[in-house]
Amino acid sequence: MSESTYPSVKDLTLEEKASLTSGGDAWHLQGVESKGIPSYMITDGPHGLRKSLASSAGETDLDDSVPATCFPPAAGLSSSWNPELIHKVGEAMAEECIQEKVAVILGPGVNIKRNPLGGRCFEYWSEDPYLAGHEAIGIVEGVQSKGVGTSLKHFAANNQETDRLRVDARISPRALREIYFPAFEHIVKKAQPWTIMCSYNRINGVHSAQNHWLLTDVLRDEWGFDGIVMSDWGADHDRGASLNAGLNLEMPPSYTDDQIVYAVRDGLITPAQLDRMAQGMIDLVNKTRAAMSIDNYRFDVDAHDEVAHQAAIESIVMLKNDDAILPLNAGPVANPSATPQKIAVIGEFARTPRYQGGGSSHITPTKMTSFLDTLAERGIKADFAPGFTLDLEPADPALESEAVETAKNADVVLMFLGLPEAVESEGFDRDTLDMPAKQIALLEQVAAANQNVVVVLSNGSVITVAPWAKNAKGILESWLLGQSGGPALADVIFGQVSPSGKLAQSIPLDINDDPSMLNWPGEEGHVDYGEGVFAGYRYYDTYGKAVDYPFGYGLSYATFEITGVAVAKTGANTATVTATVTNTSDVDAAETVQVYVVPGKADVARPKHELKGFTKAFLKAGESKTVAIDLDERAFAYWSEKYNDWHVEAGEYAIEVGVSSRDIADTVAVALDGDGKTQPLTEWSTYGEWEADPFGAKIVAAVAAAGEAGELTKLPDNAMMRMFLNPMPINSLPTLLGEGGKKIAQFMLDEYAKLSK
């Protein structure tokens, strides 16, 4: 079948059109084979292909799937700050989809990490929408470059697991636009994902699947989305209402196609709307035909494992390295002239790695190499003691005693600690930010026996570090590293490569410092997003709240210097930032240059600064590079509920260039013209608002002149009276000036009508 002969919605009966808007089974589209529309498979991601062995029969089984490369989940990959690497991960995922005849992989998920207790934080990217959008777009573009579709999810405001199927997320328009929408918006406008998955929850009272404002007004009409919207599994509660709202596909099927047929015949759904939704499904099938027509394809297992390996390396964040305890010396294996350190490895995670999150994204890896496996493969000697079990049972004194004795005889101790899967998974939120008590107790015992301790963490979202950090000279946050985490950790720990990861999420000192905790996880079926736009570092940095490790933070074996920071205006409200970053060490390494915009005086409360650009520079020892980062108009804008639009105010802004939100190398200023937006003045506009408006200012001057001439009552000019006057709507002037105030107000309205014509 050639593209010119692809079927169209015009070729289908009413019943066939209706059938396209529901799945064929749990993992297949419903095709119309007689009209040349196949029933392609769609299945889970987002950090690799999870094709259930039962999926061919349309059944659901989260535990038994075909082998696929398990890449680092977004919790780790987001710390790479490397969109090019993420694009390679996307390409590899697509190749595995082609082998398994999967037309659409369900991911990436770009919901904001509103609270670190969120059970699904492991598969989301960041607390910052700019970073989330500019990283996750690599997955979308990489996958779709190979002819396989993605499903950007979960649109929108799916930020907790508690009551996730029905909770009403009550969010202000500004918070939606500035925090919870931008990652979706950026990817839609720049990459056009072929599908978007709507969320389970309600937003301001309306389920996402039935939300016309969300799925049509915003997504399609404002952002220009031209793909299809599918429901999360079981999120469509009213097929007719959802189809009218802009939902193309319910998953899994409810076997109620006849309801759609009757709704069209009864005039509840227009034929044109059904045609639009059904044609979208045909278009999706047509986009994937070429890739799904490739037979006997086999992806390169080893090459994909190497992509996973590189991704894992760049996901590791070094939080602490006192006394340069890292890198360790592996001895003759790495350096024939070196004397090896005697190494103790303690912690079950070194033998049984936690490499991915739990739930619908659970993958069967093509291979799995633990840290202990890697040491054995590389001929690096180390003594091992598990120290604890990965269940929720109390500490085992025998395991603890063995671990302490092992530590006593070592030059350095590597302790693999973290969160077992039982406390962190899709389906529920965590109830504490703390590491399991038995692991902390073991760390304290080991540190008492040997002061040279390096902690290697395995967790899908941040944990509190401060209470136990004094017991470790080094700390590596390795998140969940996928199937090649063992080799990646060995490369970093033994100095084959410098760590380059940066935090995509702030690490607070205490969970109660998080601004969302006042309303977490909600009550009586709803959750208020009372922190508004002050999520994550936007809150911590604006209000000077101490954190353990700030957003964007990450250490290196190298040292860097950022110099020559400059900003050049490229338009009325756009600019380009340039800077030179130099590797001032003798170690090859990478540094991420981060650009934050500091607003000037504004009509609304704005965060102290916001990430609006970044670039990762790979530098040889002693090398320098000049980087350039463009700032578009949106980089300076906020969402104005007054204008129901983005708004850039005129004035001076500051541009910060640094290596974390709290490590700024230099700050430069730029003056913007503003977008010139004004709101029509009315009797309810305050006197101060009239003064600030271009037309209003002329009228205020005319009022003053008329007062001097005795034509109008003279306005009071003392400071006290001005204090009352400025915030006063002009229809209240009579309360201050009597009949004279009434005449002034009418004069102002009459003059405004003339000037604004």
UniProtKB/Swiss-Prot annotation:
pH effect summary: Optimum pH is 6.8.
InterPro entries recorded: Alph_arabinopyran (IPR048100), Cellulose_deg_GH3 (IPR050288), Fn3-like (IPR026891), Glyco_hydro_3_AS (IPR019800), Glyco_hydro_3_C (IPR002772), Glyco_hydro_3_C_sf (IPR036881), Glyco_hydro_3_N (IPR001764), Glyco_hydro_3_N_sf (IPR036962)
Activity's thermal dependence: Optimum temperature is 48 degrees Celsius.
PROSITE patterns tied to this protein: GLYCOSYL_HYDROL_F3
GO molecular function: hydrolase activity, hydrolyzing O-glycosyl compounds
Superkingdom field: Bacteria
Active site: D232
GO BP of this protein: carbohydrate metabolic process
EC number: 3.2.1.-
The entry's keywords: Carbohydrate metabolism, Glycosidase, Hydrolase
Function, in words: Catalyzes the hydrolysis of a non-reducing terminal alpha-L-arabinopyranosidic linkage in ginsenoside Rb2 (alpha-L-arabinopyranosyl-(1->6)-alpha-D-glucopyranosyl) to release alpha-D-glucopyranosyl (Rd). It is not able to hydrolyze alpha-L-arabinofuranosyl-(1->6)-alpha-D-glucopyranosyl (Rc).
Subunit: Homotetramer.
UniProt name for this protein: Exo-alpha-(1->6)-L-arabinopyranosidase
